[in-house]
Amino acid sequence: MNTKYSLPPASLLLVLTLSLLSLSSCRLSSSHLGFTKVDTARMPDCEALIVDFPIDVKVHVGERTAIVFDPEMPEQVRRELELRTDGRALLITSRREQTGFGRFLGRWSRKGAKAEVWVTSLHGLELGSSARAQLVDSITTPSLRLILSGASTLTGLRLSAGKFLFSSAGASVASGRVSVDEACQLELEGASSARFEGYADELKVELKGASSLKAPELQGRVVSAELSGASTAHIGTMEALSYALSGASRLSYRGRPVLGERSVTGASSVSAQ
């Protein structure tokens, strides 16, 4: 199957592209350079959290930055963990830089790692190294970036924002409810999956690999979807929709939106429910 359609006027993608220029899927911190060790009693007020350690964290927003470790957390695990900051973000990481198989083995010796974290505000959250985060409080912010990698997990998201970027890779899992007044961008790849509900004025979806987006209750005004590989996306109702599918990807949506540019190639498919 190889079909292409176009419908005047100009592509709906233009509106989304202009609105999403200020959003980027780059990591909040591509390395730990610029971060220095910090004591729990002397942490600055932070607006971002980076967890690069296999630990379960409960995240509170709206109070002075602090961290409290579970009293039952094994001492050997606590000794392996280190806190760093660049003055804006709090980084939870390992004292020893590990890669590859060494990092994989380290996960098995760090079971029982738990903590509660408080940040003054939250504009960015990055999870890696099989970290798991539960957002305890609802978040109201002009913009938010959530970046997941590895086999990390995010739950409890209740967001009200002007702009929202979500990027997920590896076997990461996320879920939440969002209300986005302007631009919302959801990027998934690898075997990652996400479940979202709520509303986004301008929604852009990009899926690769075997990633999956389950969002039948996520509504949008203008929606753009780009899927490849064996990815799947289920989206709710919208006013206008444009899409480009390749590989064996699948897209399903609700309602009867105005259709803009459409491209379907390979064994990919689109269905309206």
Residue ranges with predicted function:
Residues 11-22:
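Bacterial N-terminal signal peptides
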Residues 2-13:
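Bacterial N-terminal signal peptides that target proteins for export
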Residues 13-15, 33, 131, 146, ...:
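Short, functionally important structural connectors and interaction interfaces within domains
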Residues 26-148, 157-168, 175-184, 258, ...:
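Acidic (Asp/Glu) and glycine-rich low-complexity loops/linkers
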Residues 174-273:
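Short, surface-exposed interaction patches in beta-rich subdomains
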Residues 131, 152, 170-172, 192, ...:
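Position-specific detector for the leucine-rich repeat
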